[in-house]
């Protein structure tokens, strides 16, 4: 019994120590003297530790650290100073994976069988506030011709819009900005020379009105480049769809005829 009591005390002490590490990481990431490297090191350990890796707060703090660094760099921009743009955008991009896991854990029932989310409100608020900056990040890497990174940012914008947590909110609206981002995600994937990625992005974008003619043309090109038997079938199908959607264009009919010559 004594040994059991000692073991329980040690376990409780270890659990408390790890939760203290999570709080410390969050504290270090706050304020003008934030040390994001140290905060990340601490939270990385907590994300791997059995005592804290299944706590919503651990994952929330990991995303919070990324958000704090993003905001620290963006504050420089607001003040007319030059931010470290790669650092700023990489921190921005890093928020979502942590918050998705935190959100998932935050919806689980507590020890009394009740669901009482603690971090969901903040998660939704931060993701919504930062949403448009993913467009900026995609444009930044697109201009630098880092097309795969550009795709990642544009695609994360679309991904957030489609998260169930934002259903019925402004963040989920398929407005002109959404359609523009969706198009540039496809364009970036194509320019990155990744046909599979480009095809998926173009298929997603083809049913929205933004630059729909261009999307169909790019889709035909990508199916032609992919060159598998299934891609050849899809190429013909896309030519046929293009003829129906754009009956005044000779492009799709002429190219369909060429496939049979």
Regions found by a protein language model. Name each.
Residues 18-78, 83-87:
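Start-of-domain marker
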Residues 65-182, 196, 229-232:
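Short coil/linker segments at helix-helix boundaries
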Residues 56-58, 166-170, 181, 214-216, ...:
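TPR alpha-solenoid repeat register
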Residues 28, 66, 141, 182, ...:
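Residue at a conserved register position within TPR or TPR-like alpha-solenoid repeats
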Residues 51-53, 107, 162, 210-211, ...:
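Short coil turns that delineate tetratricopeptide repeat
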Residues 1-27, 242:
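Bacterial Sec-dependent N-terminal signal peptides
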Residues 24, 38, 62, 69, ...:
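Structural register within alpha-helical repeat arrays
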Residues 46, 102, 157, 204-205, ...:
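Canonical positions in the second alpha-helix
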């Amino acid at each position: 019994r004594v040994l059991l009591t000692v073991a329980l005390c040690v376990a409780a002490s270890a659990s408390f120590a790890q939760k203290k590490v999570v709080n410390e990481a969050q504290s270090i990431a706050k304020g003008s003297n934030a040390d994001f490297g140290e905060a990340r090191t601490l939270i990385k350990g907590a994300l791997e530790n059995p005592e804290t890796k299944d706590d919503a707060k651990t994952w929330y703090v990991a995303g919070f650290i990324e958000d704090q660094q993003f905001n620290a760099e963006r504050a420089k921009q607001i003040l007319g100073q030059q931010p470290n743009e790669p650092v700023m955008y990489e921190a921005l991009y890093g928020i979502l994976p942590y918050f998705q896991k935190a959100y998932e854990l935050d919806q689980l029932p507590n020890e009394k069988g009740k669901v009482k989310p603690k971090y969901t409100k903040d998660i939704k608020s931060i993701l919504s506030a930062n949403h448009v900056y993913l467009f900026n990040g995609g444009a930044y890497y697109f201009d630098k011709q880092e097309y795969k990174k550009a795709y990642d940012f544009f695609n994360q914008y679309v991904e957030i819009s489609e998260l169930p947590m934002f259903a019925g909110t402004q963040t989920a609206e398929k407005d002109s900005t959404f359609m523009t981002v969706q198009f540039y995600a496809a364009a970036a994937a194509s320019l990155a020379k990744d046909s599979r990625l480009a095809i998926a992005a173009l298929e997603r974008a083809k049913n929205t009105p933004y630059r729909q003619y261009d999307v169909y043309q790019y889709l035909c090109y990508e199916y032609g480049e992919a060159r598998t038997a299934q891609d050849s079938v899809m190429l013909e199908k896309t030519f046929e769809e293009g003829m129906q959607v754009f009956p005044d264009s000779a492009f799709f009919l002429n190219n369909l005829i060429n496939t049979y010559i």
